[in-house]
Amino acid sequence: MIHFLEQHFVELVTITSIIYLTLATILLLYQTPDTAVYKTFRRSKRLMAGGMMLISLNIWIWIASFTGSWTEYNNWVPCFDIILFYLMGICFSFSLSSLLDPHYISRKRCRTIAVKFTMTAFFALIAMTDALKAYQIPLLLIALIGLLEMLIGHIYYFNKCYLRSNALFENYFSNEKSHFIRWLKVSHWLFYGMLILGVISIRTGALFNWLVQFYVVGMNLYILVNIINYASEYETLMKADCDKTEEEKSGEASPKKAYIETLRPRVTEWIQEKSYLKDQFTIDDLATRLYTNKTYLSSFIKEEFGMSFSSWIASLRLEEAKKMMSEHPDAKLKDIAYNVGFSSLPYFSSVFAKSEGVTPSVWMKERGRNAER
């Protein structure tokens, strides 16, 4: 079996390189609305396509250097691998992070990463020279440290962007939106898994390299499908970021006590009308309805109820749901979830369990047993 895998590995990677080029082409040709909002999205998909092309290029460099023997190694291959892995890291990390934060790719960040890449590439390239052959391992280790520094930095900034986006969604949308960006976090870790496997595969046999190729193909297919699906939600989700940017520019302060006293009866009236049962709305929609602005309303909710906008709306809907479940024990949970404004039964069950400590079905059964006593 091992002999078969070694004999046909070149054919396998040739096919996979074509797959990566095909996926990159699909990304480049995929059309998005020609609006300012999608400018960052278009740049992100081009970066992602560039990363896929670099994976394909890495394969062709390996094919050109492969002698047919799995026990002989070209010492310059790891040098090129480090350089290409660094460029892949830039493409994938910049693409994924900027889909969360449109301002992520700044001139300052690009200048910094360019200097770091130049230094890493310099050590990787001089490690290939005959004059410094005796120092090849130390030089490669220095280059590898440069690669690791870049990856650790991007992991930190990506997680920062991810947490920021979740916080923005919680304070802008009435329904939970974090599931729309979960694929970005998964893709982020899948990519770093690919780099780790790529480094290990430099000095391993055919079996491990076959498995790595299947992993990388699966990762790229996952990213392609999800980035295309994400396009339909991108404009809606970016409203939260645009709103936050405008708020930071305006520098509006928290509402004064007198204004809070004016706003409180309006909020109370809105709650009594049960307008929160509407399926989907944003804090901007509610602010317009209450004749105020988003900044003041958000501050009011935090000070008055001690929670974010989406958590506050969810708590109101949960109380209404429990009332309906008590009055109509035979009702379907799915119908109750939709009637009180939740976008799906799984989301309703998740919020309910987090609040009550049990699922809605268990809660209804317990209520039923208590009523029979």
Where are these regions (language model features)?
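Membrane-proximal linker segments that couple transmembrane helices to downstream signaling/catalytic modules
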Residues: 228-339, 351-354, 361-373
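Alpha-helical transmembrane segments of multi-pass integral membrane proteins
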Residues: 37-57, 113-117, 138-203, 212-221
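Hydrophobic alpha-helical transmembrane segments and immediately flanking/interface helices
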Residues: 73-92, 204-228
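Hydrophobic alpha-helical transmembrane segments
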Residues: 98, 126-131, 196-205
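Alpha-helical transmembrane segments and their immediate juxtamembrane interface regions
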Residues: 91-110, 216-241
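Alpha-helical transmembrane segments and their membrane-interface junctions
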Residues: 62-75, 192-209
